[in-house]
Amino acid sequence: MPKKVLTGVVVSDKMQKTVTVLVERQFPHPLYGKVIKRSKKYLAHDPEEKYKLGDVVEIIESRPISKRKRFRVLRLVESGRMDLVEKYLIRRQNYQSLSKRGGKA
């Protein structure tokens, strides 16, 4: 079985030899056909610690490196996309403020 290769944005580089990569995917709703966006965060191994916040990277599936880390960074696609990181942080902040209030706005 071929290994998964995903492309995403580095949203955190605060851990040692690890980056958090946000991967977004789009798919049509099976019944209504509306395009739906979903995102997921993956922990990826970065042994040289050369990838920084905002970098667009490719990650590839690998053997388990730790409890949650099953990908490693393959290559840098584009550097310095801080606009994507800011969108993610704003969305996360809005979600956290909604959960503190106990529901939807």
Swiss-Prot record:
PANTHER family: 40S RIBOSOMAL PROTEIN S11 FAMILY MEMBER, SMALL RIBOSOMAL SUBUNIT PROTEIN US17M
Organism of origin: Thermus thermophilus
One biological process term in Gene Ontology: translation
Species classification: Bacteria, Thermotogati, Deinococcota, Deinococci, Thermales
Keyword terms: Ribonucleoprotein, Ribosomal protein, RNA-binding, rRNA-binding
Pfam families xrefs: Ribosomal_S17 (PF00366)
Keyword rRNA-binding belongs to the record: yes
Database matches in NCBIfam families: PRK05610.1 (NF004123), uS17_bact (TIGR03635)
Family to which the UniProt record says this protein belongs: Belongs to the universal ribosomal protein uS17 family.
Function (record text): One of the primary rRNA binding proteins, it binds specifically to the 5'-end of 16S ribosomal RNA.
MF terms in GO: rRNA binding; structural constituent of ribosome
Subunit structure: Part of the 30S ribosomal subunit.
Cellular component aspect of the GO annotation: cytosolic small ribosomal subunit
Protein name, per record: Small ribosomal subunit protein uS17
